Regions:
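N-terminal acidic, proline/glycine-rich, low-complexity intrinsically disordered segments
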Residues: 1-3
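Mid-to-C-terminal functional-domain signal that highlights helix-capping/loop sites
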Residues: 5-411
């Protein structure tokens, strides 16, 4: 005679196997869906949502692995107990999807869209096939100069490099037009950065050593063991390639990665970016979200200078944190630099009848002419150079978001 509790027991095991299979599938799916939903372009992220999504993404490989094992165990139970054929097939399908989900938690979706450039290659300035008016990020350290074309950087976002024995991360975010170079040294450790996602329109970076997440436009770690730490900024300039090549004829230029050259941005990529939707509300400021700014931070104070105003004026003298500031436009009428002006007053010579000496400004005190590198080329001040000030271009929505107390230059 059959045991009276056997059908009930078997029914209970069936329900348990089904619930384990379903739970494993949904948890594995959640581990993928939550980070992808929160850390994606054109969606506002608040700190707690971002923190939760990054936490889930960090735990996802472990959670999904447990789910996959549980789902496989449920399938094994279903076959051993000879459950109905359709039920075994359903559990097997759920198990397969759970295993696939577990594998996908190890995949960086953003690097599938924008592939890294792990072994960057360089060529001479003379050999580089870069248009004269294309923009490059210029870095010079210990006498070694390199240029990173923005159309290349806009796809890869991050290039880990070493210039003048200094490990650096050259970074660029096309959505907010920010090109910044950061030191990769933290507490004596050399970090290697990869693209990790996006936060309110600005790229996120993850270091391979600690899995900390860093904001590209501030260099501040917002998640992980290094949370709250800030990378050291390395001075760089955004210049036209023709101007950089004239200044650094022996410099090296980042070569395009042949595998992904077809993916690089078009020459007029900025026009397309300016039409994209932003997630930071700038309406109260009265400034359009895609107004391009030259941002300067000194002594804890930030100020945004509209690029259009700088290009029109060709020279702007202002103050930030009581520091006299000089902004000048280069001889290519496109590149910009910022310097500490000291006690001197400068006037632009861009429209004067000066011969082609490289002079772009003259000081009122001595009449000395100064070039775009900030150095006097004649007069009593000949040979002296102004101190460069770190500055970078940024769309207004991103600058305002990361510098909430910023001042704005009004022409």
């Amino acid at each position: 005679m059959a045991h009276p509790g056997l059908p009930i027991a078997r029914s209970g095991k069936t329900r348990l196997a089904v619930w384990v299979g379903l739970l494993g599938f949904f948890l594995s799916f959640a581990c993928l869906a939550i980070p992808m939903y929160v850390i994606r372009p054109f969606r506002p992220q608040d700190p707690w949502q971002l923190d939760a999504a990054l936490t889930v993404r960090g735990l996802a490989p472990w959670i999904s692995a447990v789910c996959a094992i549980a789902a496989l165990a449920a399938v094994a139970r279903a076959w051993r107990d000879r459950m109905r054929h359709w039920l075994r097939c359903a559990l097997a399908t759920l198990s397969l999807l759970t295993v696939v989900g577990s594998v996908l938690t190890h995949v960086n979706v953003f690097e599938m869209m924008f592939h890294p450039y792990p072994q960057p290659e360089f060529e001479s300035a003379a050999a580089a096939k870069v248009d004269s008016d294309d923009k490059v990020l210029s870095v010079t350290l210990h006498g070694e100069s390199r240029a990173y074309p923005i159309r290349t950087m806009g796809y890869h976002h991050i290039v880990n490099d070493t210039v003048g024995d200094t490990p650096i991360a050259v970074t660029y975010c096309t959505l907010c037009h920010t090109g910044l170079v950061w030191s990769r040294m933290v507490d004596g450790q050399t970090l290697h950065f990869r693209l990790a996602g996006i936060n309110n329109g600005n790229a996120l970076m993850r270091d391979e050593e600690t899995s900390s997440i860093w904001q590209q436009s501030t260099g501040i770690a917002i998640f992980g063991p290094f949370r709250g730490r800030q990378l050291q900024l390395v001075h760089c300039d955004e210049l036209s390639f023709a101007l950089w090549r004239k200044e650094e004829p022996r410099g090296l230029v980042l070569k395009p990665d042949a595998q992904y050259a077809s993916e690089y941005d078009d020459k007029d990529w900025e026009k397309h970016i300016e039409k994209t939707r932003t997630v930071v509300d700038t309406s109260k400021s009265g400034i359009a979200p895609h107004e391009l700014m030259l941002g300067v931070t000194a002594a804890g104070e930030s100020k945004a200078f509209p690029v259009k105003s700088i290009l029109t004026a060709k020279l702007i003298q202002d103050r930030i944190a009581n520091i006299p500031l000089l902004l000048v436009v280069g001889p290519d009428h496109a590149s910009m630099r910022a310097f500490k002006a000291g006690p001197m007053t400068f006037v632009s010579t861009a429209d004067s009848a000066l011969p082609d000496t490289g002079a772009i400004t003259r000081d009122a005190e001595t009449g000395s002419n100064w070039n775009f590198q900030g150095c006097a080329i004649d007069g009593r001040m000949a040979g002296r150079c102004l101190e460069p000030v770190d500055s970078f271009k940024d769309y207004w929505f991103d600058w305002m978001n990361h510098h909430p107390g910023t001042l704005v230059f009004r022409s």
